[in-house]
Amino acid sequence: MTKVVAPVERVVFELNGERQEVAAADVEPSTTLLEFIRTRTPFRGPKLGCGEGGCGACVILIAKYNPKTDEVTEFNVNSCLTLLYSIHFCSIITTEGLGNTKDGFHSIQKRMSGFHASQCGFCTPGMCMSIFSSLVNADKSKKPAPPKGFSKLSISEAERSFSGNMCRCTGYRPIVDACKSFESDVDLEDLGLNIFWKKGDKHPDPTKLPSYTLGGGICTFPDFLKSEIKSSLDFNDASISGPREGWYCPKSIKQYYKLVNSGLFSESSVKVVVGNTSTGVYKDQDLYDKYIDIAGIPELSAIVRKDKGIEIGAATSISRTIEILNQESELTSSPNGSVVFRKLAEHMSKVASPFVRNTASIGGNIILAHKYPFRSDIATILLGAAATVNLQVSSKTLHVNLEQFLEQPPLDHSTLLLSIFIPHWASDCKKEHTLVFETYRAAPRPLGNAVSYVNSAFLGHVSLDKSSGDNILSNLHLAFGAYGTKHAIRARKVEEYLTGKILSASVVLEAIRLLRETIVPVEGTTHPEYRVSVAVGFLFSFLSPLCKGVIESGKTLSISEDLVDTDNVHNKPLSSRRETLSDDEYTPVGDPIKKYKVEVQASGEAIYVDDIPAPKNCLYGEFIYSTQPLANVKSIKFKPSLASKKIITVVSAKDIPTGGRNIGSTFWFGDEEPLFGDPIAEFAGQVLGVVIAETQPYADMAAKQAVVEYTTDGLKAPILTVEQAVQSNSYFQVPPERAPKQVGDFSNGMAEADHKIMSEEVKLSSQYYFYMETQTALAIPDEDNTMTVYSSSQFSELAQNVISKCLGIPFNNVRVITRRAGGGFGGKVVRSLHVRI
């Protein structure tokens, strides 16, 4: 094979002040930074929560150095998505690098403790790193210097600093207070209960707060790594490769096509990456042994300002794109020219979370929207702004509008998305016209960190009809997405109908009727009526201020610069709260005191089950779940894949020791649930077997390769709803000793009631427990047929009982240890037992 690039045999970076050098042959390219930190270093601060960039438990700070400008850039990222090979010559800081029991705790960690901002503590290290990143970047800004001991961070920035971090315990208020305490203009009296001063003090003393050094007080990029970068001949090398796998870093488009056309990937799976954040949305279905990292191609990160707009490289991060759009909005003198960029930036700041936006590329988001039915906000709002894309197809460069691109069939590696061009529309808007542009989104969390139920973007030119004084729309772009469609679309019929018409109530109603014909969710879309109604509401919100007869009686809206620069009512307000305090009758009972070991939780040194160092030759397991309700399991096979080769064995009901039982859990009512669905899977999601592999990622991926064959011969139809259970007379029998006792006479009480509900129906759906720490257990066999199980459990005695029954050993031969749990809320009582066993 022709040599394409010179290989580099190592990955060099700094971790909490220490130089790390990893031989490429020792670490596979699919290894994430989180996996490396937790399995190859003593640091356990970053936690594995959701594993998809949605919870923030794994957040760390990355610093990059540019030797050409001698500048250091710091930003926080999800270490669960960041691939280890992508941080070559970077500096990494985890919460242990901020402070610890040996070197002393950082003021962030101390204030998290003092403001009672931690309960289970599993999310706390990630919270600390998000706050630290915000402080570092705020202190580097050109804002006036704050008083000693404070940061340049504003209150709104403080609230947004951990907008992507989840906490199930605290309700966020104490975390917000801890972060706000760094802000120089904060009213200390408004901060919540803390140990630094008594609630009600009229003049709290800020010097009692743990001292803070401007800039965070931590060196984010060491001099030794700067020197190594400057002197290293590897800095511009194009690949990192080992004997089995490869990580390729082309430094030009030409090098990229040399790699693609080299035949190197003809018999292996290859993945093209920039930030690898797509795996948080669409999970990899198999392992990859070769990666092409295109983030280092300069052309893909170039920013080109043109007469009619701006061209942004496809590998530019979403965070960087927001900065650029805001800068362009400020530089553009015309209100018509600034509105598009400003509104786009505002909307993009609500996409994903800050640490996802820091690494996710704008081009990658559009590629996802093209390849999958991804509910992309960015694709929709760029479609509304009439953006175009530039593609490289082998030796040809193509320019197509975004709508055409989204409708194309999936691309192969021979096609490269180069850039996105966004027009500012200033020069296209006549003097007598005013440009209007608005974007909308409806989501479970409308201000970010959740995909949309519906999103839209509307652009148009508004002019006045001289005879009537009414508004007329032209050059309309009405884009809708995420409502249950493969990709974002333009409502062409509505655009054509509205163009040139004088806006009135009847015109708006007809436009809504046409929109309902256009917005048709595909079959299987959840809540289709809701999505359509939201889309209609967005269009109405856009048109109604422009239309007489829809706005309040007696008011008219003239076209002016005010129309262009209206405040976005969807912008995030500063949060508010209300505290109810008890009196001092029983003091000191109820006085705020510091919770035990919060600093240790904040520094990442508190040990949860998955933080326990794995014993030598430790194996890992992942469940194979039933995908069918009430079906006979005939066989379990595995697809031929890279992941399937990692399987050591599969444990099932036949592997239960002699004398043991197929028992997975037991209930207070006396019923038992089997550990494995054998020979019948009683419900979808029941465990059928456990894949065993050398690492947890191997086991997780291998379990996805399982192909289960079912048959329903001789079985009745499954009962899937409460209504079906009632109809089938299938009731859960509560033992008499467990049944609730009747208090009073129900019949007499109803007869004497002043108000009666004669008939009503109430439905309660299921709800996630949403504990941050996932179900985890570590089992270590010991002498004399005993077993020690470290478990994140809320009922260790029950776990001990069920494990002994399953293994067929005496109760006292099982030792279950629970040091702490990263949340539970009832979800780690019975449902955790399968994992323990």
Swiss-Prot record:
EC annotation from Swiss-Prot or TrEMBL: 1.2.3.1
> Which Pfam families does its entry note?
Ald_Xan_dh_C, CO_deh_flav_C, FAD_binding_5, Fer2, Fer2_2, MoCoBD_1
- Necessary cofactors: [2Fe-2S] cluster; FAD; Mo-molybdopterin
An example GO biological process term is: abscisic acid biosynthetic process
Coiled coil start-end: none
In terms of domain of life, where is this protein from? Eukaryota
Q: Does the keyword Nucleotide-binding apply?
A: no
> Which part of the chain is the 2Fe-2S ferredoxin-type domain?
9-98
The record describes how the cofactor is bound as: Binds 2 [2Fe-2S] clusters.
For this protein, the record's InterPro entries field holds:
2Fe-2S-bd, 2Fe-2S-bd_dom_sf, 2Fe-2S_ferredoxin-like_sf, 2Fe-2S_ferredoxin-type, 2Fe2S_fd_BS, Ald_Oxase/Xan_DH_a/b, Ald_Oxase/Xan_DH_a/b_sf, Ald_Oxase/xanthine_DH-like
Record domain FAD-binding PCMH-type: where:
240-427
Keyword check for NAD, yes or no: yes
Q: Which UniProt keywords apply?
A: 2Fe-2S, Abscisic acid biosynthesis, Auxin biosynthesis, FAD, Flavoprotein, Iron, Iron-sulfur, Metal-binding, Molybdenum, NAD, Oxidoreductase
Binding annotation for [2Fe-2S] cluster: C50, C55, C58, C80
The protein's assembly and partners: Aldehyde oxidases (AO) are homodimers and heterodimers of AO subunits.
* Assigned protein family: Belongs to the xanthine dehydrogenase family.
List the PANTHER family. ALDEHYDE OXIDASE-LIKE PROTEIN-RELATED, XANTHINE DEHYDROGENASE
The protein, known as: Probable aldehyde oxidase 4
Q: Which organism is it from?
A: Oryza sativa subsp. japonica
Name the lineage.
Eukaryota, Viridiplantae, Streptophyta, Embryophyta, Tracheophyta
